[in-house]
């Protein structure tokens, strides 16, 4: 009577052992299959996100370059205000000289047009 009971226990142990070996042998392949499925599903979306991010980065770099260029231009204008003031002063001086020359020319033309004082 003990022998059939021992055989039953031995069979249970070997069945459990065989099942464990089978699960361990197949588990990595199932995990790799699931991983492969996940990658196949996710990869196109990730590739699209990557392309979008690269496009946004290029647009951002262009905008940053434009802003930096504009800031540089404004700074150059601010720095050149000294030259603008100098040009303004020279223009005022030129206008003053022109007005003085016009006044002098009008005075000479009036002398020519007016009759000489009579010698009486």
UniProtKB/Swiss-Prot annotation:
Residues 101-120 are annotated as: Disordered. One of its GO terms (biological process) is regulation of lysosome size. One of its GO terms (cellular component) is BORC complex. It is found in: Lysosome membrane. Keywords: Lysosome, Membrane, Phosphoprotein. InterPro entries: BORCS8 (IPR019320). The modification Phosphoserine is found at residue 109. It comes from the Eukaryota. As part of the BLOC-one-related complex (BORC), it plays a role in the movement and localization of lysosomes at the cell periphery. Associated with the cytosolic face of lysosomes, BORC recruits ARL8B to the lysosomal membrane and couples lysosomes to microtubule plus-end-directed kinesin motors, driving lysosome movement toward the cell periphery. PANTHER family: BLOC-1-RELATED COMPLEX SUBUNIT 8 (PTHR21146:SF0), MEF2B PROTEIN (PTHR21146). Component of the BLOC-one-related complex (BORC) which is composed of BLOC1S1, BLOC1S2, BORCS5, BORCS6, BORCS7, BORCS8, KXD1 and SNAPIN. Belongs to the BORCS8 family. This is BLOC-1-related complex subunit 8. The gene is Borcs8.
